[in-house]
């Protein structure tokens, strides 16, 4: 992920804000908070964040020293004051590259507060900043389907630690990683997904210090053409979470100072949006409401040449919620208040503070192959459809059907498409729904209390962005971390998952269209390519199966078939095979059903290869044995014969879980489940291989065109 910023410095009134008159956040300020929060800047590798700040100024206005600090000096004489904020953030470096292509990490520096800090990276996208580019990968998680057969279930474990982290970037060997320029000690962070709530709050990793850096840039830009008494040094410093030498170098090289005003990310208060700021050492400034607060941890200053307990060093902080989590949240009004405070510290009266407009371009790694496959599956992934709420998925599938198709929607919402002629009647079924949550109740303070649909690891959803799906537009929010996330001793929380979406009361939530028992809640999702052959997303189960059915229709002429074929895109499979149960009752003349669903593979860095060992990239999978079905030798040989005849690469094996085929077994209809191998089931980072999708599509097409083998 690269940020190419084109900044427009000729500003209209709409791109300015008057601090005293604002209730909602300034749009330009919010945009900068969002964009800057996406930058990766682990301590000692702050280049991306520094480049963003530099691009806010004209060339030469900021000086970059040998440690990477950014400095701007304005004015002359006394008093001499320093205002400083950190550029760095907590993060990881690559500590080991395995021969099988998986990557191990080690945390860098300090600032990892709370027992769940590393758990919040499990099962989510990451950014690896190589020497030449930013690459995307996933932090792996054990497949949820296997938890019932594990001797030590995930839900019974202590919190996830950094020692357990494995990264998957779609590589199969260490040499493949080398060709992509991934090396030891490359920095790694979460792939950050900032959330704006009600145009009043912004949530993102390390948003307090990120917001402070933007606020300081606004102050510096606003006064650089104004005459004032004394000297002001603005500094965006490096290395704070490693050794503190960034700020130390600025003080030694640009001091001595009469006053030093330092942003302290470790000052905490939950009183957001109350026009208060936090202070370690109080300084009386008219109009500023400072609350004395002690930091939760101290800075590390090894072998320091500076007395950081000096009386002329004043520390300021921002109130926030969910501190030190991926959804650390600040009020935009508090960021504006910090800008106002720093101007008062400098005794400078600025009526209007300029926030530059921002235009940005995000360049992504391009790939040469499987673009058609990616585009189709990506469109399906882009639609949300928790069980019983599949409407948008259904609409897309209907739009993707060929012109000759005459689909029907049955009473429960399944898409049923029958074509071809003949006595023999076979069916294929893939489900449209995905796992997720629905609103089970609403608390008096407006929090949405959730209940799960499907089987997942609920801790993976804690402290992540949320989308609340109403009848109108989705509402952004955050999945709150559990109340004791700092001190929790268990991986699984005993509390129900909750969402904060900016509501202050139950009535506000109801007025916004939240319906108890109906409204569904998910994470935002987007399909990402992690290598030439592989992609990751939440919801491949079963959007890949849905895509395989659609692809098999592309070049099909139904008039050439000598058997009847029914395709079913079913609803609510994850909630108990609701759609397929209804379909099976009405399609009892079917001779064989082929459920098209995920094969949960042990092809991951955790699992025993003696179970479900069907590697990604080795072709479609015949699910011979699963939790609810054991395929006959006759039917296995039948599918293998079709595959061999058509030179289709297939695998076969056993795995956990079941499919829509179970509903048809009750009517005496044999079920032959066909799948693609997938990693990290029912997580936000399920991984698939495009080659397996194509193999599965070819197998479906061959079965349709080979009635004598059915």
Give names to the regions the model predicted.
Residues 19-710:
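N-terminal hydrophobic/helix-forming segments and targeting peptides
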Residues 14-15:
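N-terminal signal peptide c-region/cleavage motif recognized by signal peptidases
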Residues 1-6:
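Positively charged n-region of N-terminal signal peptides that target proteins for export
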């Amino acid at each position: 992920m690269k940020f190419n910023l084109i900044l427009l410095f000729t500003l209209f009134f709409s791109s300015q804000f008057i601090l005293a008159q604002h209730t909602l956040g300034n749009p330009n300020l919010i945009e900068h908070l969002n964009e800057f929060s996406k930058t990766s800047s682990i301590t000692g590798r702050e280049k991306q964040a520094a480049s963003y700040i530099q691009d806010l100024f004209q060339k030469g206005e900021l000086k970059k020293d040998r440690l990477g600090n950014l400095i701007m000096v304005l004015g002359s004489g006394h008093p001499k004051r320093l205002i400083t904020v950190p550029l760095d953030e907590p993060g990881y470096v690559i500590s080991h590259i395995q021969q099988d292509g998986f990557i191990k990490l080690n945390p860098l520096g300090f600032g990892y507060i709370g027992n769940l800090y590393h758990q919040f990276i499990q099962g989510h996208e990451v950014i690896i900043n190589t020497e030449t580019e930013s690459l995307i990968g996933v932090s792996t998680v054990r497949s949820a389907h296997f938890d019932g057969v594990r001797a030590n279930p995930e839900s019974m474990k202590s919190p996830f630690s950094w020692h357990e982290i494995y990264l998957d970037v779609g590589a199969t060997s260490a040499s493949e990683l080398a060709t992509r320029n991934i090396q030891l000690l490359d920095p790694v962070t979460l792939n950050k997904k900032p959330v704006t709530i009600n145009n009043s709050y912004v949530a993102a990793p390390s948003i307090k210090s990120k917001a402070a850096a933007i606020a300081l840039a606004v102050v510096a830009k606003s006064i650089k053409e104004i005459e004032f008494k004394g000297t002001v040094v603005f500094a965006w410093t490096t290395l704070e979470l490693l050794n503190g030498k960034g700020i130390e170098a600025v003080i030694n090289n640009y001091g001595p100072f009469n006053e030093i005003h330092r942003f302290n990310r470790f000052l905490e208060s939950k009183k957001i949006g109350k026009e208060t700021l936090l202070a370690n050492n109080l300084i009386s400034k008219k109009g500023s409401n400072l609350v004395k607060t002690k930091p939760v941890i101290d800075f590390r200053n090894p072998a320091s040449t500076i007395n950081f307990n000096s009386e002329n060093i004043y520390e300021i902080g921002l109130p926030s919620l969910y501190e030190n989590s991926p959804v650390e949240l600040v009020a935009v009004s508090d960021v504006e208040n910090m800008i106002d405070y720093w101007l008062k510290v400098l005794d400078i009266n600025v009526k209007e503070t300029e926030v530059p407009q921002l235009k940005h371009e995000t360049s992504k790694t391009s790939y040469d192959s499987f673009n058609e496959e990616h585009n189709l599956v990506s469109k399906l992934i882009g639609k949300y459809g928790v069980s019983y709420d599949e409407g948008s998925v259904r609409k897309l599938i209907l739009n993707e059907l060929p012109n000759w198709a005459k689909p029907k929607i049955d009473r429960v919402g399944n898409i049923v498409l029958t074509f071809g002629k003949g006595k023999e009647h076979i069916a294929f079924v893939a489900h449209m729904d995905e796992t997720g949550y629905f609103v089970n109740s609403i608390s008096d303070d407006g929090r949405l209390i959730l209940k799960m649909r499907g089987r997942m690891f609920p801790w993976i959803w804690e402290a992540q962005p949320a989308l609340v799906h109403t009848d109108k537009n989705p509402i952004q929010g955050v999945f709150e971390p559990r109340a004791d996330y700092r001190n929790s001793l268990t991986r699984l929380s005993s509390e129900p998952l909750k969402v904060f979406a900016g509501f202050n009361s139950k009535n506000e939530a109801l007025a916004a269209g939240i319906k108890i028992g109906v409204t569904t809640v998910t994470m935002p999702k987007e399909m990402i390519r992690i290598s030439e052959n592989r992609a990751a997303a939440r919801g491949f189960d079963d959007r890949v199966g849905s895509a395989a059915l659609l692809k098999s229709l592309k070049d099909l002429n139904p008039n050439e078939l000598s058997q009847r074929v029914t395709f079913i895109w079913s609803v609510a499979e994850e909630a108990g095979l609701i759609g397929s149960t209804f379909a099976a009752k009405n399609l009892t003349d079917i001779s064989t059903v082929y459920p098209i669903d995920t094969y949960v593979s042990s092809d991951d860095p955790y699992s025993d290869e003696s179970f479900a060992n069907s590697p990604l990239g080795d072709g479609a999978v015949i699910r011979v044995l699963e939790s609810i079905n054991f395929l006959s030798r006759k039917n296995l040989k039948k599918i293998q014969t079709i595959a061999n005849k058509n030179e289709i690469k297939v695998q076969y094996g056993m795995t956990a879980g079941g499919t829509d085929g179970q509903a048809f077994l009750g009517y005496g209809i044999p079920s032959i489940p066909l799948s693609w191998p997938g990693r990290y089931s029912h997580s936000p980072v399920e991984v698939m291989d495009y080659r397996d999708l194509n193999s599965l599509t070819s197998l479906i097409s061959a079965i349709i065109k080979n009635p004598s083998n059915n």
